[in-house]
């Protein structure tokens, strides 16, 4: 098993011309205590950050060491964000203290209305080593991007705070790698693409921006697998998922349900895969209409990768990097006139399915603080429940990429505000007196953002009329399942809905989706698998569930092996080697005699196998 072991270390001393200008990246702190690394919004703010996600209980301190070159008085700035400011004009709940060598300098995180550098105080520091700490005061998701310590008067750090400025202060090392196939995104689709290609002889790099594998099916998000496997024209597809798929179904369940270690073992067993967990893809280098290499950054150390290959697959969902490559894409809902879809709106718009912040409570007597930061609950509009799963969905009328942090934050705001009402004010609060929050997601479970355009765009008629295509590949079996704001929630919170509903349009039989939906129409060496494949918004309602995206990944891995074998690009497989691809899909790549453990959460009765 080839592995890249990123040496995660904190470069806490500014490596620039002035030893008295020091940038401490929070995600690189030597000890994070109870703070979590949050990389979800790097495309917008250029950096991960630490978040104190304690569900109302302060988390353990984070700290790191740094060196001062000259004794003197230093100003201390913290880049932070008062996360409830879009809904509440006063101080927010995310307060935390900062200090040096055990002495508090100031409190921050609960004022302002955007990510910004806040001056928290001064500290007299002697030359030599010191220890900087973050002390959470509330447990309500205070966040710290970076700390800037300077002895220069009026040396306020750059507000833009982009990667170039950070790199100048803290240079990072770059590691290069050459592969046959680079897969970006370690969810179910990316895992299946990487393993399939590796078993067919390709040297594969698999890049994932979280430390755990499985994407929405990991213990960080906790969405169960959905859809049927081993059905349709190519019954060999899907058996691979038996090898790593959790045996239990259910959303928002205890972490053990999602079997993170099983997924990791599944990947580590493949000698042809080099794993890069904790690396976020941030850029591309192009060679004409092909990707030459992808760059990625470690979400803790800041170390960089440059991975080159003749073939790439993007399986991240948002597809930000390949948009930088110029790949054609769309987002939102097509109007009826474009594809004559019955379930499309009359005119196109930017509405998407939302992102879920799931949660549950457990037994335990614990007080919960008053949480009033812009959500006004009462007994007529609150949710009198002990848990919230996929229906706790936000952001359907917001941009799922540029407004992703606010969408996630609004999800957390509603959970905390509702729970505070139930615990402290509800007429039925006695029912909740022996309950406490057991888990609230801070990694949002996205359903939809960008969709990349391939040589074919799957639409509603293809599915409902069972239109045959010669390049039929993976089968989609889930209903056309399109989410929209819940009608009662809309009445109670117009324009600020946090609950969703759906109408399932059941499929009568599996539908075999064209292979041409799995590669880009204008970036010639780019495959895609996952919720970002070439489909309309309506068609995405069926193709987006995770067993189905896993089979998409299998097809991509098989096609990549044929690209290498015949020295062609993805389109060349369709034009010249379709029979060979069909043979691979019918045979499958999954191991034989693996127990059939995936008999939950499907909408078509499984075939006996």
Which residues make up each language-model segment?
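Extracytoplasmic
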Residues: 20-173
């Amino acid at each position: 098993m080839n592995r890249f072991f990123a040496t995660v270390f904190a470069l806490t001393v500014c490596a620039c011309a002035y030893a008295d200008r020091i940038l401490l990246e929070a995600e690189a702190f030597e000890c994070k205590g109870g703070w979590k690394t949050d990389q979800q919004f790097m495309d917008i703010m250029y950096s991960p950050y630490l978040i104190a996600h304690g569900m109302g209980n302060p988390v353990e301190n984070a700290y790191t060491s740094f060196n001062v070159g000259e004794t003197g008085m230093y100003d201390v700035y913290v880049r932070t964000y008062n996360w409830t400011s879009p809904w509440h004009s006063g101080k927010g709940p995310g307060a935390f203290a900062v200090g040096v060598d055990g002495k508090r300098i100031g409190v921050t995180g609960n004022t302002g209305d955007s990510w910004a550098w806040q001056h928290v105080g001064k500290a007299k520091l002697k030359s030599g080593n010191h220890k900087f700490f973050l002390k959470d005061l509330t447990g309500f998701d205070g966040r710290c991007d970076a700390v800037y310590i300077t002895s220069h008067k009026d040396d306020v750090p750059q507000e833009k705070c982009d990667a170039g400025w950070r790199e100048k202060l803290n240079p990072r090392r770059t590691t290069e790698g050459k592969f046959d196939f680079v897969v970006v995104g370690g969810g179910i689709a990316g895992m299946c693409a990487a393993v399939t290609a590796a078993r067919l002889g390709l040297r594969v790099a698999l890049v994932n921006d979280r430390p755990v594998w499985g994407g929405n099916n990991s213990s960080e998000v906790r969405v169960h697998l959905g859809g049927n496997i081993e059905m349709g024209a190519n019954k060999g597809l899907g058996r691979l998922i038996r090898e790593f798929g959790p045996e239990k179904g259910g959303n928002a369940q205890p972490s053990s349900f999602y079997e993170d270690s099983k997924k990791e073992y599944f990947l580590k067993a493949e000698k042809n895969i080099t794993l890069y967990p904790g690396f976020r893809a941030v850029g591309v280098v192009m060679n004409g209409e092909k990707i030459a290499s992808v760059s990625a950054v470690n979400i803790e150390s800041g170390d960089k990768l440059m991975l080159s290959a003749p073939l790439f697959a993007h399986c991240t969902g948002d597809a930000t990097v390949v948009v930088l490559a110029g790949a054609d894409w769309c987002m939102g809902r097509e109007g009826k006139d474009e594809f004559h879809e019955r379930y499309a709106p009359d005119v196109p718009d930017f509405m998407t399915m939302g992102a879920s912040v799931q949660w549950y409570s457990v037994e335990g007597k614990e007080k919960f603080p008053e949480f009033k930061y812009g959500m006004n609950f009462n007994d007529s509009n609150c949710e009198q429940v002990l848990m919230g799963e996929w229906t706790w969905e936000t952001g359907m009328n917001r941009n799922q990429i540029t407004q992703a942090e606010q969408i996630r934050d609004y999800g957390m705001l509603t959970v905390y505000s509702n729970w505070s009402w139930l615990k402290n004010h509800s007429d039925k609060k006695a029912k909740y007196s022996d309950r406490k929050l057991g888990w609230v997601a801070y990694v949002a479970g996205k359903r939809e953002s960008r969709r990349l355009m391939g040589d074919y765009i799957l639409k509603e008629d293809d599915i409902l009329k069972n239109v045959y295509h010669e390049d039929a590949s993976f089968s989609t079996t889930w209903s056309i399942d399109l989410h929209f704001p819940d009608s009662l929630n809309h009445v109670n919170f117009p324009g600020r809905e946090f609950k969703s509903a759906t109408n399932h349009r059941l499929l009568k039989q599996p539908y075999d989706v064209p292979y041409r939906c799995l590669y880009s129409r204008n970036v010639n060496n780019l495959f895609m698998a996952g919720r970002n494949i070439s489909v309309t918004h309506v068609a995405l309602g069926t193709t987006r569930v995770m067993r189905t995206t896993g089979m998409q990944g299998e097809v991509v891995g098989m096609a990549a092996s044929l690209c290498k074998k015949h020295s062609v690009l993805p389109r060349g497989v369709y034009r010249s080697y379709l029979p060979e691809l069909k043979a691979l899909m019918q045979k499958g790549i999954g191991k034989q005699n693996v127990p059939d453990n995936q008999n939950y959460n499907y909408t078509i009765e499984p075939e006996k196998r």
